[in-house]
Structures are given as C-alpha cells and as structure tokens.
Swiss-Prot record:
Quaternary state and interactors: PSII is composed of 1 copy each of membrane proteins PsbA, PsbB, PsbC, PsbD, PsbE, PsbF, PsbH, PsbI, PsbJ, PsbK, PsbL, PsbM, PsbT, PsbX, PsbY, PsbZ, Psb30/Ycf12, at least 3 peripheral proteins of the oxygen-evolving complex and a large number of cofactors. It forms dimeric complexes.
Family, similarity comment: Belongs to the PsbL family.
Organism: Chaetosphaeridium globosum (Charophycean green alga)
Highest taxon, organism lineage: Eukaryota
Gene label: psbL
A single GO BP: photosynthesis
Protein name: Photosystem II reaction center protein L
Transmembrane segments: 17-37
Signal peptide stretch: none
Chief place where the protein resides: plastid
Record InterPro entries: PSII_PsbL, PSII_PsbL_sf
Length: 38
C-alpha cells in the first residue's frame, strides 16, 4: 500500500464525521418522536 494522501485522508475523516453526525441526529429524532408521541 502506498502512503495515503493527507488531503484524501482529511476528506475521508470529514465524510466519517458527517456520517456519524447524521446518525446521531437520526437517533435523537427517533428518541424525541417516541418521547413526544407517548
């Protein structure tokens, strides 16, 4: 394997953090909807 490009690495990191952020928002939305509709 060649050494990873730092730019590529930062883009990958941003994509991963964006994915986790969206996942966290989705989970919070589900929890809040369950809380409000009960």
């Amino acid at each position: 394997m060649t050494t990873p490009n730092p730019n590529k690495q930062s883009v990958e990191l941003n994509r991963t953090s964006l994915f986790w952020g969206l996942l966290l928002i989705f989970v919070l939305a589900v929890l809040f909807s369950n809380y409000f509709f009960n």
